Swiss-Prot record:
Transmembrane segments: none annotated. InterPro entries: CsbD, UPF0337_stress_rsp, YjbJ_sf. This is UPF0337 protein Bd3330. Pfam families: CsbD (PF05532).
Amino acid sequence: MNKDIFQGKIKEISGELRKKWGALTDDDIQKTKGNMEALSGLVQQKIGLSKEEASKQLSEFMTDIDKKFTSTGESASDKVNSKIDAIKNKLSH
């Protein structure tokens, strides 16, 4: 997930972050404004991990989230396209 997409989806991702690291609050997460370095520092501080371990875990988390959002996005996109096709079909008859 690239940086801009991550920053745009921070609200959606916030719940997943709290599931993984319960010590994080929505407020903490929102203050990072989707900045990966700030988020890594937050995980490091709140969870008590080394800088390297926090970065590693956050990177793994983002890979998992990216897969989740990608697969969800594709199925939602497929549904939307299907509805659009159905509407076009109705209008053409």
